[in-house]
C-alpha cells in the first residue's frame, strides 16, 4: 500500500506544487514537496575522515571505513601520534592527507613552514591527494602548487561563518591556480545558501573543473547528500556519529545505505519535506527505502526551512 501511494504521489507531484505552496504560505510548514526537475547523475565518491587520535585507533578506523569509503582523508592535525607510511600502506582506498590549520577548523599548532613540510612528506610517501588551504601564505602556497608532483592537490577554502556573496569571484580566483581539485566549503545560515554551492558545481562542470562544494551546519546537510549527485567530486561522511570533522557532517553509512549517493542513476528527481524542525521526521528513512524497493532512482531529503516564501523564491526555478 505504501509503495503504491508513493508511486501515485510521484506521478502527480507537479499538479500538487501550486497547492502545496499556497498551503505552506498559510502556515502549514511540514508538508512533502518534490524538487521535480530531472537531473543527470554524476559518479561521485564518499570520503571518510580518519581522525585518530592514536596510530592504533587510526589503523582500526581505516579497516572499519573500507566498506563505506571510496576514499579516505587522513587528518594529521587531529592525530596525537602517527606513522604516515604505515597509515597509507594500511589503506586499500586512495587517501587525502590533510593537515588543517586552526583558522580553518583544524588543530595543527605548528608553523606554516612545518605544516607544508608534512604535506610534502605525504607526497613523497605516495599519498594520492594532499589538501592545502587558500589561506596559506602566498610565498608558501605558490611554489607548493607549482612543484612537480605525482599527488593531486586539493586547493581548499573554508568559511565557518556564512556563505559570502562573492563566492563566484572566489571560485574564479581558485580556478586560476594550478590545483587539480577545488574545494569550497561555507556555512549555511539559510537553506538557500546551498543553491550558491549547487550553482558552482553546475558552473564547474561547464568549466571542466573538479569541485568539492559543500555547506556546513544543519541547514547545509542537504548539500552533503545532493552535491555529489549534482556533480561534486566527493562528499564527506563521518565513520560514525561523534567523529564528524565539520558541522552538519552526516555518517558515511547514511550517505551510502539510506541516500545511495554512489548508486548509478541515469536521471533522478529530488523529493523532500520542508519545515522546522524536520529531523524528527522519519520520512527520509521510509521514502528512500521505498524508492529502493521499487527500483526508483529518486531521492528524498529533509529541507530545514525557516522562511517558506524565500525558499520557494530560491528553489522555484528547479520545479517543473
Name the predicted role of every residue range.
Residues 233-235, 252-320:
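N-terminal ligand-binding/catalytic initiation module
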Residues 46-59, 65, 69-148, 154, ...:
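Active-site beta->alpha loop and helix N-cap motifs at the rims of alpha/beta catalytic domains
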Residues 136-267:
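Catalytic alpha/beta core domains of metabolic enzymes, predominantly
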Residues 1-2, 17:
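Methionine residue identity
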Residues 32-33, 38-41:
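Short, positively charged and aromatic/hydrophobic N-terminal segments
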Residues 21-23, 28, 38:
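Polybasic, lysine-rich low-complexity intrinsically disordered segments
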Amino acid at each position: 500500500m505504501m509503495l503504491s501511494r508513493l508511486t501515485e504521489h510521484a506521478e502527480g507531484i507537479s499538479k500538487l506544487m501550486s497547492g502545496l505552496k499556497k498551503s505552506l504560505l498559510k502556515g502549514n510548514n511540514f508538508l512533502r514537496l518534490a524538487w521535480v526537475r530531472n537531473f543527470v547523475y554524476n559518479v561521485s565518491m564518499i570520503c571518510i575522515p580518519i581522525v585518530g587520535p592514536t596510530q592504533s585507533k587510526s589503523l582500526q578506523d581505516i579497516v572499519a571505513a573500507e566498506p563505506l569509503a571510496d576514499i579516505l582523508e587522513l587528518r594529521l592535525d587531529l592525530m596525537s601520534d602517527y606513522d604516515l607510511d604505515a597509515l597509507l600502506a594500511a589503506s586499500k582506498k586512495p587517501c587525502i592527507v590533510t593537515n588543517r590549520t586552526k583558522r580553518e577548523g583544524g588543530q595543527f599548532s605548528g608553523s606554516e613552514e612545518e605544516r607544508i613540510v608534512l604535506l610534502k612528506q605525504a607526497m613523497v610517501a605516495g599519498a594520492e591527494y594532499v589538501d592545502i588551504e587558500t589561506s596559506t601564505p602566498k610565498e608558501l602556497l605558490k611554489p607548493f602548487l607549482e612543484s612537480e608532483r605525482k599527488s593531486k592537490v586539493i586547493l581548499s577554502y573554508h568559511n565557518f561563518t556564512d556563505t559570502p556573496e562573492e563566492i563566484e569571484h572566489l571560485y574564479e580566483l581558485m580556478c586560476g591556480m594550478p590545483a587539480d581539485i577545488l574545494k569550497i566549503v561555507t556555512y549555511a545560515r539559510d537553506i538557500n545558501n546551498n543553491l550558491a554551492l549547487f550553482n558552482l558545481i553546475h558552473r564547474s562542470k561547464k568549466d571542466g573543473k573538479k569541485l568539492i562544494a559543500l555547506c556546513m551546519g544543519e541547514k547545509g546537510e542537504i548539500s552533503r547528500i545532493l552535491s555529489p549527485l549534482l556533480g561534486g567530486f566527493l562528499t564527506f561522511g563521518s565513520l560514525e556519529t561523534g567523529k564528524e570533522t565539520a558541522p552538519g557532517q552526516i555518517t558515511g553509512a547514511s550517505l551510502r545505505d539510506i541516500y545511495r549517493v554512489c548508486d548509478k542513476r541515469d536521471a533522478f528527481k529530488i523529493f523532500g519535506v520542508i519545515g522546522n524542525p524536520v529531523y524528527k521526521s522519519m520520512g527520509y528513512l521510509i521514502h528512500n527505502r521505498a524508492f529502493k524497493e521499487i527500483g526508483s532512482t529518486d531521492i528524498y531529503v529533509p529541507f530545514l526551512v525557516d522562511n517558506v516564501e524565500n525558499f520557494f523564491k530560491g528553489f522555484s526555478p528547479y520545479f517543473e
